[in-house]
């Protein structure tokens, strides 16, 4: 389970049979639908990359959208057709939020499905409609009456720290313990990605580090609370494949 299209795609490309996603932001589901339609349209990672890589001359272009739109549901078709009409310039707007991928142009480095071998595995999986979506945020996550091998929270806790719903380490620790107790299968894991969020919780607030140094600093500074774990066996020991899993038992 995750709240990120990229993590859902990486999991499917790595062999997951089903992925559950949750997000209260309806726009996120429209973006997911557009990404899935792109995968259904193009038989290679290069075709997908042309539309989604931010340094591509065809990034979010209306021309490629005209190829992709027929793989959208009627609701998603109506939404994206409205967005793309009149040549609305998505490239120069903040319509799709700028992230580290935009700043560093890294999405093809941090997501294995941009590799053609794994893209083809992803495409094969996507055609089986393996992604289940829920209209809720992390504070209502216990309404999902399922259990999972991996719950991948990515940077979600950062946002909820800012709005004080998960405002301190003790609150987050209790939340994660309940998450593991109620929703994780035996031997499963709740994973929090620290690859580019240096101030996720207060014990990270003092860090002033670069993207490249962050994993090592956290590992060395908090050896009792953190251990390294690769999200998938397809990764080597480079930064691209490493995330940090918070131990849930003090």
Segments the model singles out, each with a brief description of its role:
Residues 4-16:
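Conserved SAM-binding loop of SAM-dependent methyltransferases across substrates and taxa
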Residues 21-26:
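Conserved acidic E/D residue at the C-terminus of a beta-strand in Rossmann-like folds
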Residues 27-127:
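Class I S-adenosyl-L-methionine-dependent methyltransferase module
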Residues 139-153:
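A short acidic, Gly/Pro-enriched loop at the edge of an enzyme's catalytic core
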Residues 166-186:
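A short glycine-rich, Lys/Arg-flanked "PGG" loop and its adjoining helix->strand segment in the class I
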Residues 222-250:
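Core SAM-dependent methyltransferase catalytic element
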């Amino acid at each position: 389970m995750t709240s990120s299209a990229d993590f859902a795609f990486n999991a499917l490309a790595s062999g997951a049979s089903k992925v559950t996603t949750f997000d209260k932001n309806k726009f996120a589901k429209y973006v997911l639908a557009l990404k899935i339609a792109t995968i259904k349209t193009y038989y290679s990672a290069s075709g997908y990359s042309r539309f989604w890589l931010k340094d591509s001359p065809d990034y979010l272009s209306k021309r490629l959208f005209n190829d992709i739109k027929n793989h959208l549901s009627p609701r998603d078709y109506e939404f994206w057709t409205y967005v793309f009409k009149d040549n609305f310039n998505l490239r120069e707007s903040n319509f799709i939020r700028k992230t580290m991928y935009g700043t560093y142009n890294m999405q093809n480095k941090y997501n294995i499905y941009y590799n053609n071998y794994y893209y083809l595995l992803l495409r094969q999986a996507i055609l089986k409609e393996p992604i289940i979506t829920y209209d809720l945020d992390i504070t209502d996550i216990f309404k999902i009456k399922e259990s999972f091998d991996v719950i991948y929270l990515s940077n979600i806790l950062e946002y909820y720290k800012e709005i004080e719903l998960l405002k301190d380490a003790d609150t987050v620790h209790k939340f994660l313990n309940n998450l593991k107790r109620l929703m994780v299968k035996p031997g499963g894991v709740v994973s929090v990605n620290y690859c580019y969020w240096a101030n996720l919780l207060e014990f990270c607030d003092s860090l002033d580090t670069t993207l490249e140094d962050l994993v090592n600093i956290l590992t060395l500074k908090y050896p009792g609370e953190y251990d390294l774990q690769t999200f998938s066996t397809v990764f080597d020991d480079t930064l691209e494949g490493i995330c940090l899993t918070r131990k849930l038992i003090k």
